[in-house]
Amino acid sequence: MTIRELEGFYKGKRVLVTGHTGFKGAWLCRMLGLAGAQVTGYALSPPTDPSLFEIAGLEDCMDSVIGDIRDLKHLREVFDRVRPEVVFHLAAQPIVRDSYKDPVYTYETNVMGTVNVLECVRLTKSVRSFLNVRSEEHTSELQSL
């Protein structure tokens, strides 16, 4: 798909991306910005230094909100302010090894954080499209601890 084709759908649309400071989220925001979308991101601070988010200069071409999807009140405030038409949910704790080290944090983020995003989508009348993106890693395979 070309940027021109993406423009046909996204130009001028209000798009909210959770996890925008991560690798996939940063690339998605870059493409959405090039397609003319009004992009707002909601995520923890960039996970690496330097990060793709910073290298790509995304902080200068989008609205970046630092927050935690486990914080329903703050997330709801952002949804109310932005009134997104499209929501991409990429925020997660994606590292399998880390999930073994801190399963409670992983559950709170990946399950309850997603519940919070879905609740905000449900309560935000402007949302017309929602996409939930997951990691390429899977905890279903047994790995040595």
Where are the model-predicted features located?
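N-terminal Rossmann-like NAD(P)+-binding domain of SDR-like oxidoreductases, especially those catalyzing
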Residues: 1-140, 144
